[in-house]
């Protein structure tokens, strides 16, 4: 903002981020509900100072892609879908057994989010959820996420620079 109170932006995303479940899990705030509330002309029922962060959350985007083949799209029909269940787990998905994944649209078929009191417990919860998540008939990024959640990742020893 300049001295005349004019706003300038280099970039602005006026949409809800794909990763919003991470924020929601760590704050208990329902961002979708609140966006609708504000869009309807109503005030938020809380102030910024009312929001407290608790724990850690991790989100894995599950795509109909083949991680063993440069993440090429994997269209087709989901023949089996067994979703993970339990505490501290959130699965946002419309996919089901019999669902056809098209080559013509975004191949994301689910967002899996796990919360824990600590980063380590969030990672443990995610590892369990990924083990329980079964999707057959197409290739998915589930095995890729399972490989990422290794000792190197959980102990922060992965290289982060090329």
Question: Can you name each region flagged by the protein language model?
Answer:
Residues 1-156:
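ATP-dependent carboxylate activation and anion-phosphoryl transfer catalytic cores
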């Amino acid at each position: 903002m300049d001295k005349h109170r004019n706003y300038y932006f280099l970039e602005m995303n006026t949409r809800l981020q794909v990763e919003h479940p991470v924020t929601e899990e760590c704050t208990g705030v329902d961002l979708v509900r609140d966006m609708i509330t504000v869009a309807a002309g109503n005030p938020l029922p809380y102030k910024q100072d009312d929001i407290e962060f608790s724990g850690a959350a991790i989100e894995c985007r599950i795509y109909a892609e083949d991680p063993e083949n440069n993440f090429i799209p994997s269209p087709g029909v989901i023949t089996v879908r067994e979703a993970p269940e339990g505490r501290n787990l959130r699965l946002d998905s419309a996919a089901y057994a019999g669902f056809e994944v098209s080559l013509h649209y975004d191949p994301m078929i689910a967002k899996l989010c796990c919360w824990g009191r600590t980063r380590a417990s969030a990672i443990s919860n995610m590892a369990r959820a990924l083990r329980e998540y079964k999707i057959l008939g197409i290739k998915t990024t589930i095995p890729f996420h399972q490989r990422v959640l290794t000792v190197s990742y959980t102990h922060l020893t992965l290289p982060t620079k090329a």
